[in-house]
């Protein structure tokens, strides 16, 4: 069993297999949906490139290890069981903007001149919120989570708020000059909207001709929690990490918790923030499985995760060939 888990955690072959399965599932989803085209395949390419960048970004931020590729593997696995993201949509833009913002925030640790970084990071959050307006509700908590970086004070908080507001000032100025102010009303309606989407569902056969529809949002939450909770417990109990590394991980955990709570209160956030959640849980969750100490319980947990993933992947394929 230890050899199996070592292969999954440390082998680049495991990452390549996960990436190829993910690409295959998404290409099939694009063809099956009939929404193919340049944008859909560009979307696929962006997710592939982004997955390749996760490892190097984590290593530069001192939150990852060069000895493991598991965070990248988990990212591709999370994408593979969510083929509804294959079609080009706003979530792709939000993913790039939000994770770029997180990386800028990770450079502010004890920074005496962090105002520029806070402004730039939250300007990206502001742009992302133009695509997903209800993200604005999470901004105060995102700012507070930056307190783990020991650089949050009155001036940096003001810089963060200004960063969020500047994209709106530019956008509304353009709308005013082009006589498209009616779009502001559409933005406000989206900001104040409740649950206004039809969640994708996974249909599980429970009998002859009968199926049980499980919302993909529930499946994603279970998958994310199974990854994140053990890692968070280990992170809390372990004192071996560097101080800066722990600060960055605390901020990431705070942001992930903010997204979880936000999605529970405003489920419509799930549509655009789902890929961000996949990325954060992959980044945080891998830490539980890379400990030097051998643990049969950890090995069983990892293999259980992979079995569940294969089951979900298989049900997705079965759903594609079945009619209801």
Walk through the language-model features, giving the residues of each.
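Membrane-water interface signatures at transmembrane helix termini and the short loops
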Residues: 228-296
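Perimembrane helix-loop-helix junctions
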Residues: 138-162
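Juxtamembrane membrane-water interface segments that cap and precede transmembrane helices
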Residues: 23-31, 186-218, 228-232
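N-terminal membrane topogenic signal
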Residues: 1-20, 64, 297-301
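Membrane-interface transmembrane helices that cradle and orient dolichyl/undecaprenyl
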Residues: 101-116
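Membrane-interface alpha helices of multi-pass inner-membrane proteins
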Residues: 117-131, 260-263
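Transmembrane-helix motifs of polytopic, lipid-linked glycan transferases
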Residues: 45-61
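Membrane-embedded helix bundles of polyisoprenyl
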Residues: 68-83, 95-99, 121
């Amino acid at each position: 069993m230890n050899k199996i888990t070592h292969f999954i955690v440390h082998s680049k072959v495991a990452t390549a297999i996960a990436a190829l399965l993910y690409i295959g599932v998404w290409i099939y989803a694009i063809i099956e949906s009939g929404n193919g085209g340049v944008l859909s395949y560009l979307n696929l390419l962006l997710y592939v490139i982004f997955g390749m960048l996760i490892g190097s970004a984590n290593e530069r931020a001192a939150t990852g290890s060069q000895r493991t590729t598991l965070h990248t593997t988990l990212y591709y696995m999370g994408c593979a069981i969510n083929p509804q993201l294959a079609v080009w949509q706003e979530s792709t833009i939000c993913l790039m903007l939000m994770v770029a913002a997180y990386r800028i925030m990770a450079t502010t640790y004890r920074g005496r001149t962090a105002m520029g970084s806070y402004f730039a990071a939250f300007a990206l959050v502001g742009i992302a919120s133009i695509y997903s307006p209800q993200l604005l509700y999470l901004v105060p908590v995102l700012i507070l989570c930056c307190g783990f970086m020991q650089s949050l004070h009155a001036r940096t908080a003001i810089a963060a708020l200004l960063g969020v507001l500047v994209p709106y000032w530019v956008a509304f100025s353009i709308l005013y000059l082009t006589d498209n102010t009616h779009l502001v009303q559409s933005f406000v309606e989206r900001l104040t909207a409740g649950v206004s989407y039809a969640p994708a569902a996974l249909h599980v056969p429970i009998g002859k001709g009968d199926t049980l529809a499980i919302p993909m949002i529930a499946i994603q939450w279970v998958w994310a929690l199974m990854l994140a909770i053990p890692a968070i417990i280990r992170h809390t109990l372990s004192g071996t990490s560097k101080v800066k590394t722990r600060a960055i991980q605390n901020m990431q955990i705070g942001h992930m918790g903010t997204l979880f709570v936000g999605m529970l209160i405003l489920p419509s956030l799930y549509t655009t923030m789902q890929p961000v959640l996949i990325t954060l849980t992959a980044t945080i969750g891998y830490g539980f499985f890379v400990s030097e100490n051998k643990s049969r319980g950890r090995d069983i947990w990892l293999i259980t995760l992979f079995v569940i993933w294969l089951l979900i992947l298989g049900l997705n394929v079965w759903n594609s060939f079945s009619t209801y």
